[in-house]
Amino acid sequence: MAEKRKYSKKYCKYTEAKVEFIDYKDTTLLKYCLSERFKIMPRRLTGTSKKYQEMVEKAIKRARHVALIPYIVDRDNVVTNPFEGM
């Protein structure tokens, strides 16, 4: 039988920083919850609490709608650090 993956306990960056609102225009704050292909990372990997994960998801979706963050990235255009040029 396959072994279960064990994830280490991670702590919410937003709770520690006492963030009250996550703005969709602040892409540097949103980069912690995006993968190198600009996909939203799950809570178990980022350690974000449920409250802040919902706020982050809404902010990322709004930023995508306003074209601050791309929806998808092609396999040829994958970047290691998506916010390097900002």
Swiss-Prot record:
UniProt keyword annotation of Ribonucleoprotein present: yes
Listed GO MF terms: small ribosomal subunit rRNA binding; structural constituent of ribosome
Entries under InterPro entries matching the protein: Ribosomal_bS18 (IPR001648), Ribosomal_bS18_sf (IPR036870)
Role played: Binds as a heterodimer with protein bS6 to the central domain of the 16S rRNA, where it helps stabilize the platform of the 30S subunit.
GO CC term (a single one): cytosolic small ribosomal subunit
SUPFAM superfamilies hit by this protein: Ribosomal protein S18
The keyword RNA-binding is annotated on this UniProt entry: yes
GO biological process: translation
Assembly behavior: Part of the 30S ribosomal subunit. Forms a tight heterodimer with protein bS6.
A Pfam family hit: Ribosomal_S18
Homology family: Belongs to the bacterial ribosomal protein bS18 family.
Top-rank taxon: Bacteria
Name of this protein: Small ribosomal subunit protein bS18
UniProt entry keywords in alphabetical sequence: Ribonucleoprotein, Ribosomal protein, RNA-binding, rRNA-binding
PANTHER family in UniProt: 30S RIBOSOMAL PROTEIN S18, SMALL RIBOSOMAL SUBUNIT PROTEIN BS18M
